[in-house]
């Protein structure tokens, strides 16, 4: 995912945590906050060390990024933070995709109807 689509700064994460809205399911928590002037979404991913070793955490992050790449054109321009919860570590990429799509639909972050 290109740099323009990333949230990296701790101050940006903290601002979204404080002022953003959250939606969750068993596997993921989504924090979102609108931002004036954004033409596309920006994504931050947080996977705790409690979920496993670096290999496991990176696999989860890759699956999350891939899901957002697939839906890049379908997303509303928002700042989005995805936090992985413990059940996500045992999921396949397809299960992660379905779970993320579910929580994104609940959060109403798609700009059109996704099957």
From Swiss-Prot:
It comes from the Bacteria. It catalyses: Endonucleolytic cleavage of RNA, removing 5'-extranucleotides from tRNA precursor. One of its GO terms (cellular component) is ribonuclease P complex. Pfam families: Ribonuclease_P. GO terms for biological process: tRNA 5'-leader removal. Its EC number is 3.1.26.5. Keywords: Endonuclease, Hydrolase, Nuclease, RNA-binding, tRNA processing. One of its GO terms (molecular function) is 3'-tRNA processing endoribonuclease activity. SUPFAM superfamilies: Ribosomal protein S5 domain 2-like. Consists of a catalytic RNA component (M1 or rnpB) and a protein subunit. RNaseP catalyzes the removal of the 5'-leader sequence from pre-tRNA to produce the mature 5'-terminus. It can also cleave other RNA substrates such as 4.5S RNA. The protein component plays an auxiliary but essential role in vivo by binding to the 5'-leader sequence and broadening the substrate specificity of the ribozyme. HAMAP family: RNase_P. Belongs to the RnpA family. This is Ribonuclease P protein component.
């Amino acid at each position: 995912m290109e740099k323009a689509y990333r949230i990296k700064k701790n101050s940006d994460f903290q601002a979204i945590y404080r002022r953003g809205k959250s939606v969750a399911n068993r596997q993921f928590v989504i924090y979102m906050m609108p931002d004036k002037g954004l033409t596309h979404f920006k994504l931050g991913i947080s996977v705790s060390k409690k979920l496993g070793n670096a290999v496991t955490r990176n696999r989860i992050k890759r699956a999350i990024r891939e899901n957002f790449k697939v839906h890049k054109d379908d997303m509303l321009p928002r700042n989005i933070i995805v936090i992985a919860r413990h059940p996500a570590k045992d999921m396949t990429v397809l299960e992660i995709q379905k779970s993320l799509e579910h929580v994104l639909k609940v959060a109403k972050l798609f700009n059109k109807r996704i099957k």
